Amino acid sequence: MIMQKRLLNRNSSVVKSRNCLARHQHESSISKLHVSLRLHRCLRPIVRFDFLHNAGSKVCSQNSCPSPQLHVGTMALFHTVFILWPHFCGILWTVHEKLYNYLLSIEVY
């Protein structure tokens, strides 16, 4: 009987330590995810559209431009991306916050 109690106590402490380790690993992985997403957080592009447009205009001057349509199309694409970028970042950050809060709410046993 005493031997069974010792074995039971030892087993329960092993289970407790495993649960504690699992909880710690869970919290650690969530923390790492949060930090990495913060580091890679969507920042507004440093290079502004007008800078790109001016640089493109210098490279693609009227007399040496291989294709005016290509120049206009490329600038339109850059313009669209830079206008939509902050909205995309906002959506991405909202999804990240919801995922982070959900992962924190999960109980690990």
Curated annotation (Swiss-Prot):
One of its GO terms (cellular component) is membrane. Its main location: membrane. It is a single-pass membrane protein. The chain crosses the membrane at residues 75-95. It is found in: Membrane. Keywords: Membrane, Transmembrane, Transmembrane helix. It comes from the Eukaryota. Overlaps YLR122C. This is Putative uncharacterized protein YLR123C. It comes from Saccharomyces cerevisiae (strain ATCC 204508 / S288c) (Baker's yeast).
